[in-house]
């Protein structure tokens, strides 16, 4: 009887799976991300991040999780944004944008999880 009660209590938890969403880290938040589809093929994605921290950001890395309309995971890719010769650092309150190639079959949506942030003072968080 205890075993049956245990499974009955766990059953509602199986339906409580939250839908995919964007995840920021250390004050760097995902403002928007969407996949670029051409003739039914996912060719890449656009990402817009915002530096809501009190420090200046010079690099961000993330994992892009690709889903279809049924929220089935179709694939994962890593991406990164870095300041350099043509790209300025992101001061507090500023945004960062990037466009990445992907080529994930059947993907219609992309959700971003920021995995690492590097600041100009040499500190970082994540991995």
Where are the model-predicted features located?
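Beta-strand signatures of extracellular beta-sandwich domains
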Residues: 61-65
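Residues at beta-strand starts and edge strands
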Residues: 41-43, 58-60, 108
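Short acidic/proline- and small/hydrophobic-mixed sequence motifs that coincide with surface turns
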Residues: 55-59, 73-74
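Sec-dependent N-terminal signal peptides
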Residues: 3-14
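Intrinsic-disorder/low-complexity, polar/charged segments enriched in Ser/Thr/Lys/Arg/Asp/Glu/Gln
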Residues: 42-46, 94-97
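Transition segment at domain starts
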Residues: 15-44, 124-127
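Asparagine-centered strand-capping/turn motif at beta-strand->loop junctions
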Residues: 48-54
């Amino acid at each position: 009887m205890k075993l049956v009660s245990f499974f009955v209590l766990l059953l509602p938890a199986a339906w409580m799976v939250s839908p995919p969403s964007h995840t920021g880290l250390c004050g760097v938040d995902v403002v928007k991300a969407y996949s670029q589809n051409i003739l039914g093929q996912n060719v890449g994605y656009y990402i817009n991040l915002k530096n809501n921290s009190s420090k200046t950001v010079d690099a961000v890395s993330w994992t892009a999780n690709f889903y279809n309309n049924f929220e089935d995971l179709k694939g994962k890719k890593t991406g990164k944004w870095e300041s350099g010769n043509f790209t300025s650092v992101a001061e507090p309150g500023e945004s960062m944008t990037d466009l990445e190639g992907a080529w994930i079959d059947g993907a219609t949506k992309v959700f971003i999880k920021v995995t690492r942030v590097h600041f100009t003072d040499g500190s970082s968080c994540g991995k």
